[in-house]
Amino acid sequence: MAYRICLIEGDGIGHEVIPAARRVLEATGLPLEFVEAEAGWETFERRGTSVPEETVEKILSCHATLFGAATSPTRKVPGFFGAIRYLRRRLDLYANVRPAKSRPVPGSRPGVDLVIVRENTEGLYVEQERRYLDVAIADAVISKKASERIGRAALRIAEGRPRKTLHIAHKANVLPLTQGLFLDTVKEVAKDFPLVNVQDIIVDNCAMQLVMRPERFDVIVTTNLLGDILSDLAAGLVGGLGLAPSGNIGDTTAVFEPVHGSAPDIAGKGIANPTAAILSAAMMLDYLGEKEAAKRVEKAVDLVLERGPRTPDLGGDATTEAFTEAVVEALKSL
């Protein structure tokens, strides 16, 4: 049986990095069937919606989805909504999984191999804001249900890793009702995972420790806003957003995406770095149970990052296509 993979290029360099990731996926030799769909700003301009209903239907008909990048306007546009935020809510993709691992590139700290698991559906990102004259108020929603399931997802990830360690990053010392509910709930769920070493850490200390001693961390679970910040910090430790993959995972489907934006300044020039998209594809293979193929893809990427060619953002002069073909050749040699 072939795996059905939904491909959404999105905007900007998404049109370059998703075809690159597809090329690498095809080189794995796995039985794959690709289904193309559209979403993003370009789709909104053309069709009046950033996520057409048929795109949602295609995602639901596939085993997993690989998304490229989406542009967001810098002004308020009536009727527009961010494609990824919409899909997270519509498909209940409650776990945002962001690995940060040392790579053989300039600026990457050695010894980093961690995963940040971020609750993806609530917190301050419920976008319930209001303003009264000169005062603006935003609601933060933390529920026991969402805290239980993100805690369980993070604990499963930690249980499957060699160090089996989970840090719960929180701000319960200042926000005891909301952050305290999250912390207490994850601790309660952790009783079902006796093999996992569970510790809690105040988020500001966590940020400092990530900078000073990132090698101490294995898996970190936290709330939406805090995870959004910590995961970009972690990406900065290992080479930046251009190398950062991610997965938005629910109980029935998942959407994987490179963390970088649509990069309109280089879109169409053929020099975009496809590493994050290819590593997101590797995460997708792991999600599908093809763990050996996922490891081979990651190994092939590291081989090319180490010996070249590299794209301009990493100090080289390779095109997107040249880098991709080098990864394909490395993959074939493994």
From Swiss-Prot:
Q: Which UniProt keywords apply?
A: Amino-acid biosynthesis, Lysine biosynthesis, Magnesium, Metal-binding, NAD, Oxidoreductase
Catalytic reaction annotation:
(2R,3S)-homoisocitrate + NAD(+) = 2-oxoadipate + CO2 + NADH; D-threo-isocitrate + NAD(+) = 2-oxoglutarate + CO2 + NADH
Q: How is the cofactor bound?
A: Binds 1 Mg(2+) ion per subunit.
Q: Site Important for substrate specificity and discrimination against 3-isopropylmalate: which residues? A: 85
Q: What is its EC number?
A: 1.1.1.286
Binding residue positions for Mg(2+): 204, 228, 232
What residues bind (2R,3S)-homoisocitrate, as annotated?
72, 85, 88, 98, 118, 125, 171, 173
State the Gene Ontology BP annotations. isocitrate metabolic process; lysine biosynthetic process via aminoadipic acid; tricarboxylic acid cycle
The UniProt disruption phenotype note reads: Does not grow on minimal medium. Requires alpha-aminoadipate or lysine for growth.
Binding-site positions, NADH: 70-72, 173, 261-265, 273
Q: Does this entry carry the keyword ATP-binding?
A: no
Domain of life per record = Bacteria
EC primary class: oxidoreductase
Which pathway? Amino-acid biosynthesis; L-lysine biosynthesis via AAA pathway; L-alpha-aminoadipate from 2-oxoglutarate: step 4/5
> What are the protein's GO molecular function terms?
homoisocitrate dehydrogenase activity; isocitrate dehydrogenase (NAD+) activity; metal ion binding
Q: Which coenzymes or cofactors are required? A: Mg(2+)
- Subunit relationships: Homotetramer. Dimer of dimers. The homotetramer can transiently dissociate into homodimers.
Q: What else is known?
A: In vitro directed evolution leads to mutagenesis of key residues and increased activity with 3-isopropylmalate.
Q: What does this protein do?
A: Catalyzes the NAD(+)-dependent oxidative decarboxylation of homoisocitrate to 2-oxoadipate (alpha-ketoadipate), a reaction involved in lysine biosynthesis through the alpha-aminoadipate pathway. In addition, has high activity with isocitrate, but is inactive with 3-isopropylmalate.
This protein is called what? Isocitrate/homoisocitrate dehydrogenase
Name the gene that codes for it.
hicd
